Every structure is written in C-alpha cells, then in structure tokens.
C-alpha cells in the first residue's frame, strides 16, 4: 500500500482551497502567482498537536504541491523528530504564493488582504484546541502568528509559541556576508536547542524519544526525509529524498522565473541502462 495525503476533502479546508486569493491580493511583481498557491503539509483531520508556520513555498514545493519539502522542510522534519512527533503536525506558510525578489515578502508583512485569508487557515487549525504548540520559522512567520494572535487572544493564550530561526538562516546569513556558513549554522542550532525544552514541555509526543540537543554542525539524522503520507496520491518516492532534485534555471531573469528543472536523483534511476 502507498499512503498519501487526501488533500482538502473536508470543510473548512475545501472552501479554503477553492477560494484562495489571486493576483489582486498577491501582486505578481512580488509573488510567483503563475505557479499557483501551495497551501499546507501534514494533518488536516484534527490530529495535529504542533503547527509549523513557515514563510513561503520554494522550488521543490512548487512541484510537490505541499510546503516545506526541500532542505528547509527536511531540517524541520528532523526538529519534529527530536520532539517525538512523527505524524501529529500540520504546516502552513505566511504566504501561499512563492515570494519573488528581495523584499517581496517584507513589503507585505502586515498586508490586510493577505492576512485575512491566512487568518482563516489559522482559525481552522488553532481554534479547535488540539494544537498545543506553534513553531514559527523566522521573522515573517513570527509576525504573522502575532497578527493572528491579536485577533484571537483567548486561543493564543493557551498556545506555546516557539519563534525559532528559519531553517535556511545559515545559507542566507552567510550569503549576505559578515558571518561564515559554519558560524551561522552553529548560531541556528544553538537557537533551536534553546527552544527544545519548552517545546517538549508543551507537546505530547507520538512516541517517546531521548532528549537530544544539536551540535554545532549538521549531523547524520538531523535532516529527515519527508513522509510519503504528506504528499499527494501517486507521488514518486524520490520526492521525499534528501537530495535536491529541483532548481530554477534560465539564462536571464525572465526565463528563470518561468522554468523549474527537475532531475531524478541517481539513486532513484532504477530503469535498465540506456545507450
């Protein structure tokens, strides 16, 4: 049998998936609306006890139609595993469309129309009182959660918020200069370690796991493959791979925005040799 995510087969998620905002709310100069919205990953059946709030979908997510499946998602999957959470989670993003260009997301941090739709998702996931902790990935996600909390103070009061550094902070910080990739990675992992005890105290695990902190670098097991049960029916198994298999390509900005190149990882090329 091949487990899969059933998608948006129940309310209010059916209405949320069919009634998403378009370019009138998400301006194409700041968002890749041409690739369509990507809504979530994880459980929508009321069994989630942790909500992960991310930023925006990237390249791998555009292909799989589920969020946080690339390297950032694999790092988050490893964080959840440290809490003993293997299935009782759900994930949504601050923006349902991929951000385009520097500052595209920041310009819309408090956009009321974008927030109104996002709040409907957060209401659907957080008001039923099954989720006990929210993990916000980065500044934009933390701000988005706090904007929602202002509209639902009673619900927010019972939730534990872990506002952690975004999982790709090391790459973005080192690319900006002033810090090495190694130092930025150590900074990220130290930040995650700081939040682990309180998260454990507020989250009932799916299975008991020993308490472990991160080191100063990524170690074996720190990244976890995406469960196939989180992906649409018929998804190829290599979509869960730790290998990077999708990237934007093109000789200029116009073509690069229009093109995603998908390459099946070597380990998944199980067909007979070709000549």
Residue ranges and their predicted role:
Residues 1-275:
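A polyanion-binding, active-site-adjacent surface
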């Amino acid at each position: 049998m091949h487990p899969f995510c059933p998608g948006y087969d129940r309310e209010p998620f059916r209405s949320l998936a069919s009634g998403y905002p378009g370019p009138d709310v998400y301006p194409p100069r700041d968002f890749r609306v041409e690739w369509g919205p990507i809504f979530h990953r994880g459980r929508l059946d009321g069994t989630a006890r942790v909500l992960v709030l991310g930023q925006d979908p990237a390249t791998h997510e555009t292909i799989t139609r589920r969020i946080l499946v690339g390297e950032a998602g694999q790092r988050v999957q490893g964080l959840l595993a440290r809490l003993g959470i293997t299935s009782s989670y759900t994930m949504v993003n601050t923006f349902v469309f991929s951000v385009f260009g520097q500052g595209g997301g920041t310009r819309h941090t408090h956009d009321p129309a974008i927030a109104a739709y996002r709040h409907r998702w957060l209401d659907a996931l957080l008001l039923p009182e099954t989720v006990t902790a929210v993990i916000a990935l980065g500044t934009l996600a933390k701000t988005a959660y706090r904007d929602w909390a202002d509209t639902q103070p009673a619900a927010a009061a019972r939730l534990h918020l872990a506002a952690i550094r975004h999982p790709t902070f090391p790459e973005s910080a080192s690319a900006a200069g002033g810090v090495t990739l190694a130092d930025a990675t150590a900074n990220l992992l130290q930040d995650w370690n700081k939040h682990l005890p309180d998260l454990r105290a507020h989250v009932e695990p799916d299975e008991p796991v020993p308490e472990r902190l991160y080191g100063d670098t990524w170690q074996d097991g720190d990244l976890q493959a995406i469960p196939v049960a989180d992906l649409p029916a018929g998804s190829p198994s290599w979509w869960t791979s730790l290998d990077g298999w999708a990237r934007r390509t093109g000789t200029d900005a116009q073509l690069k925005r229009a093109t995603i190149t998908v390459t099946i990882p070597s380990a998944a090329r199980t067909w007979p040799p070709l000549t």
